[in-house]
Amino acid sequence: MALVPIAELGNYLHIYDFKVDPAHIDDFIRLFNEFDYGDDNPMHKSAAQVKDGALVQDVADPSRFWLIGEWSDIEVHARIRKTLVEMKPAFIKHVVGGKFVPAYGKVVSATPQDILDRAQKHKA
C-alpha cells in the first residue's frame, strides 16, 4: 500500500476534542457509528469533505475522544454542522457537557507524494 499524507496542503482539519461518560463508552461508539454510517449524515453529502473523519479514542484516558476529518472549506463544514446540531443525534447524550464543537486547523505542511513514494521504495 502506498504511503499518502494524512492531509493535503491548504486543506483544513476539524478536530473535535471531547469526553464521553465512562459508563456509556460502548453505547456512544455504537450510536456514533449508526449515525455516521447512516444515510442521514449531512457531512457525507458535501463535496467540501475531502477525507471522511476518524473517531479516535485516547489510550491513556478511554473516556477522551477526538474526531478528525479533512475539508477543503471550513465555512461549509460549519454550516453543515448547524444542521447536524438541529438533528440532535443520539450519541450526543453521552458527550460530557453536551459540547461537540470542533477546532479548525489549516494544513500548512504535508509531505509531498514524490517523497513518500521514494520512502516506500526503500521500505520494500
Whereabouts are the PLM-identified features?
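Short hydrophobic/aromatic beta-strand element in the GNAT-like acyltransferase core
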Residues: 13, 52-53
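A short, glycine/Asx- and small/polar-enriched loop/turn
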Residues: 61-65
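Short, surface-exposed ligand-recognition loops at beta-strand->loop->(often short) alpha-helix junctions
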Residues: 19-34
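Non-catalytic surface loops within mature trypsin-like serine protease
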Residues: 20-22, 73, 109
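An amphipathic, aromatic/His-enriched active-site/gating alpha helix that lines ligand/cofactor pockets
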Residues: 34-52, 60, 70-107
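Short beta-strand/turn micro-motifs at beta-sheet edges
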Residues: 1-6, 53-57
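Acidic/histidine-enriched, glycine/proline-rich intrinsically disordered or flexible terminal extensions
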Residues: 4-7, 106-124
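Active-site-flanking beta-strand signature of metal-NTP-handling nucleotidyl enzymes
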Residues: 11-19, 66
